[in-house]
Design a protein with these regions (language model features):
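Short secondary-structure boundary segments
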Residues: 32, 79-81, 103-106
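Alpha-to-beta junction loops
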Residues: 70-75, 95-99
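Active-site neighborhoods of divalent-metal-dependent phosphate/nucleic-acid chemistry enzymes
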Residues: 73-83
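Short low-complexity, flexible loop/linker segments enriched in glycine and/or proline
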Residues: 72, 92-93, 115-119
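Acidic, metal-binding active-site segment of PIN/NYN-like and related structure-specific nucleases
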Residues: 97-114
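Hydrophobic residues within well-ordered alpha-helices
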Residues: 66-69, 87-95
């Protein structure tokens, strides 16, 4: 659970702030759905691997965002998610000091959009990878 300005809680305990990291320090969640082509996700996975990282896919973007907040994943990227799958998870990550790409809640509710979150250090790397991959 997270409340803006009050941290992220798991099983009644407040989660500690995310520590700075690099792509080589763990796994990055990668989301994919049939709403988008495979070109972008192929580029994301290749870019993560080429940077010395490892990717993880569990078919639940919402759960992956919670894993980032808890430090189980270094970050997460997906070209398109619906608001109900991501806005709460983005708050979870932001409340533990992770980076979360700015979103318009209104735009996300109407049409969904790209989601990128990450631990300090990883977030900027994932933004660059996502910009490159999803612009194609």
């Amino acid at each position: 659970m997270a409340i803006c300005g009050q941290g992220t809680h798991l099983s009644g305990m407040i989660l500690q702030p995310l520590q700075p990291a690099n792509l080589t320090d763990g796994s990055v969640g990668v989301g994919f759905s049939n709403r988008v082509t495979t070109v972008g996700v192929n580029t994301v996975v290749s870019s993560i691997l080429n940077a010395g990282g490892v990717f993880h896919r569990n078919a639940s973007g919402a759960l992956s965002l919670a894993y980032v907040a808890d430090g189980r994943l270094l970050g997460y990227t997906e070209k398109h998610m619906n608001a109900w799958d991501c806005l709460a998870g983005q708050l979870l990550v932001a409340e533990v000091g992770g980076g979360s790409e700015a979103q318009s809640a209104e735009a996300m509710i109407k049409q969904g959009g790209r989601v990128v979150v990450g631990a300090p250090g990883v977030f900027d790397q994932l933004i660059a990878i996502s910009d490159h991959a999803y612009s194609a």
